[in-house]
Amino acid sequence: MALLQTSLIWAVYAIVVAVLVMVASVFIYTYQTPRDRSSVVTFTCIVAITSLLATVLLLPVDVALTSSTTSSKLGQRKPWATQDEVDKIVSLLTAVYYLLYSLDAFLCLLAIPFVYFWYEEYDEVAVESGEQSAAKRLWTAFKYTISFIAIVVVLFIVGFLVPVANIKDSKVSDYLRKLLAENRGERVLTFTLGLLITMGLFLYILYTSTGLAVLPMRMIRAAPSVSDMTWKASTSAQLESNRERQRQLEGRCRGDPGLLSSKERRELDTLVRDERTLIRRQRLAEEADGEGQSRFMRAWLKTTAFFRPLKLLGGIAILLITLMIWISMLLTAIDKAKNSICKQRCGYILSGIGVFNPINWIFVQSAKVFPIDYAVLTVVVLLLFGSSVVGISTIGIRFLWIRIFHVRKGHTSPQALLLTTAMLMLTILALDYSIPMLVAPQYATFGPQTFCDRPQGQQSDCLTNKHLIKPCSELTDNTAAKRVCTPSVTSMFLNRVTISYPFFGTVFFWSQFIFLVIYLLVLVTSFIRHPKLDERLLDQEAEEAEEERLLTSSARGVGDTYQSVGGRNNFSTRAG
């Protein structure tokens, strides 16, 4: 029975990973530009995003496997769950986490930088002339990546040398003391994980909080589209006015612009440029209405218009979910600030839940029937991931106030895509702390596990005394709880980071308040401000689409000419 249950849990995880591959693929193919696609860049981005999401979504497997050793109705371990069996489960999960965290660090710190430099080194002219070989390109990319290798080496050295905290507080339980990184290998991984989460928190605070507020508001109060009748009428009126003014100026000079004054010539040049822009806008509006489109596209446009009310309902549902997440995080943060056993000395670790947390309660109850909790957590994680993507596309990739790259659907360059993937990886690592430690701390630590709170020597289960069944907690001194309760490996990893290096724990904790404040400010701003159509961005996209259309038509023309010339040559050869 135990083997069957364990196999089913891992089978569900395999299905979820397959879904994550599809999610990552859809994201990458949706955002990358069709003109500059690179299979290596695409593959790297998909693997990196899948790996990080798989790490976060290993949590329900962790909780399900550790909770499968106990009976929550009786508050005792199941007959098969000997300490050896429990240790095997914990060891397997620990090995999987080590593998995933190591893979995540490798992809983020080495693989993505290498692929970025490898793509940057590509020179089409040099390749065609034979000046740039594949080996030379790889070597140049490796030379640039050496700086990142040096960073990894420094991290390893610092992780080896930095001493862990010396916890002397008598209130700290033996369980937490045992979490202190004991060997050098654990110290390196613990320190590196803490540093990467800290880096990710800055992105999480800026992008995820913004996206979490903007996403539902975009669905509820969508900006006017190019198919909007008012916008179309305004564009047509502007185009007609523009052409009328051009006719006046051309009539004044009788077809010879040299007769116009310098001011009028500048005005005419501006009118010609504006006319091209207005024609592009008019073409976009016609395409949005299905004119000149295939039957499939016209059917798709009608379907999306029909289901537009569902978008409004979806936006309201997402808004309610995000507000519930915000409230749950705020309640847990206040609970940590008030009831943490050793405050900043151990990174604000919370050993027991003192405040009701709605999201945590939903997870604990759903965990009793696996995989309901898995489905709920997957929705929450993908919502936060999607919010991070929306935040990055809204703000863009910036250095201070300078925008380096735009991230837009169908217009994201491979370099921007790699940087976005690296940012998302760090953001997801920050989520890997926030979800278990603030959104659902009890669920992420013990799940639905309970113990029978009876004095030692009495009956070990509470079959006849249901009121003595209590949820597992690190704070309890009952030996039965220590014998029955098994904390998740996720909670052990994260608590080890915060208790071994309290500085990280303090940064993790206070950054959550900044996240909550920024979310609230952006949400209020989104409520007040009415969304507008970004005509500048629209013109840029229309210009890029026109350039791509011209390039495609010219390439097709060259191909037809080549075929016709080849056909004539073949005919001449046969005739000869």
Curated annotation (Swiss-Prot):
GO terms for molecular function: cobalamin binding. Residues 549-576 are annotated as: Disordered. InterPro entries: LMBD1_LysCbl_Transport, LMBR1-like_membr_prot. It comes from the Eukaryota. Glycans are attached at N570. GO terms for cellular component: vacuolar membrane. It is found in: Lysosome membrane. GO terms for biological process: protein localization to vacuole. Disulfide bonds: none annotated. Residues 561-576 have a biased composition (Polar residues). PANTHER family: LYSOSOMAL COBALAMIN TRANSPORT ESCORT PROTEIN LMBD1, LYSOSOMAL COBALAMIN TRANSPORTER-RELATED. Probable lysosomal cobalamin transporter. Required to export cobalamin from lysosomes allowing its conversion to cofactors. Belongs to the LIMR family. LMBRD1 subfamily. This is Probable lysosomal cobalamin transporter.
